[in-house]
Design a protein with these regions (language model features):
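Metal/cofactor-centered catalytic core regions of large enzymes
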Residues: 1-281
């Protein structure tokens, strides 16, 4: 629970921490605060940005930090980690899934006639890793489905451990965390509970890791690094930038709530990949 191990800073995000603490300091998610402080763009209006204030606050995302470093998460990160550890003999007893990841990378390298370190850490490599990950997920789904069927056939129909589910058995103050390696990358939910009710809830989702604004000490997030030094052929049609960002498979808000300065809800815009967008007054 130490912020130097795992925390979020808001130095360049449109949020603020208590004045005595300062926005540059990282807070652990269990101590997280989500207090909006929208300062607007450097030039333009609050609704029509022309230039963001890169030296100040410029993003609605906080900056997650792992041991003081920004990180890229997702299929590319997983494949690079597993492949590197395998080649450095740090995985003496590889699982079948890890072996499959190594075999996938080497198969692509053979087709491209390029070493993994050449094609993998690129936009194309990031996109390819997502496709390879989908193939791996299919094999893993079949593996665990077979185990589920075997359990049911043996009479084991339990699907969850309910021993600690009853809130009346909890201490007056407690906390918990859910950690999961989602398809897009590292996902964590952090909750504080007092008297059986949630007192604070913080989420750090994969796109927050990748799309975060820079940290003055740790540097730029993955999106920003991917865009830097990228040549754009047509300035007002930056297709190269769009491709770079899309390679991360961004998870954008599917429901956006608009509030005025008094905290009154103005409207809700919900998007659906099949039905399009709907607006509620």
């Amino acid at each position: 629970s130490h912020p130097e191990v795992f925390g979020e800073s808001v130095g360049h995000a449109w949020y603020e921490y208590p004045a005595a603490m300062g926005d540059a300091k990282a807070l652990h998610p269990w101590d997280g605060i989500t207090q909006a402080k929208y300062t607007g763009p450097k030039t333009g209006t609050s609704t029509e940005w022309k230039e963001l204030n890169e030296q100040g606050k410029y993003s609605w995302l906080k900056t997650p930090l792992w041991r003081g470093k920004v990180c890229e998460v997702g299929p590319l990160a997983r494949y690079i980690i597993v492949y590197t550890k395998a080649k450095q003999n740090l995985l003496p007893d590889m699982t079948w899934a890890e072996q499959m990841m190594v075999d996938q990378i080497e198969a692509v390298s053979k087709v491209l006639n390029l070493a993994p370190e050449v094609w993998l850490p690129t936009m194309v490599g990031r996109t390819a890793a997502r496709a390879l990950d989908a193939q791996l997920a299919g094999e893993m789904a079949r593996f665990f489905f077979d185990k589920l069927v075997a359990n049911i056939n043996s009479g084991d129909t339990q699907v969850a451990n309910m021993e600690k589910w009853d809130p009346s058995s909890w201490p007056k103050k407690t906390r918990g965390v859910g950690l999961y390696e989602a398809p897009r990358g590292a996902l964590s939910h952090w909750v504080n509970i007092e008297n059986g009710r949630i007192s604070n809830y913080q989420c750090i989702v994969p796109t927050t890791w990748n799309a975060c604004p820079r940290d003055d000490k740790a540097g730029h997030g993955a999106y920003e690094l991917a865009m830097m030094d990228t040549r754009v052929k047509v300035a007002d049609k930056p297709l190269e930038i769009v491709k770079a960002v899309r390679s991360f498979d961004p998870c954008m808000a599917c429901s956006t709530h608009f509030f005025n300065a008094k905290g009154e809800k103005l409207r809700v815009v919900t998007t659906d990949p099949y039905l399009g967008a709907s607006v509620e007054a």
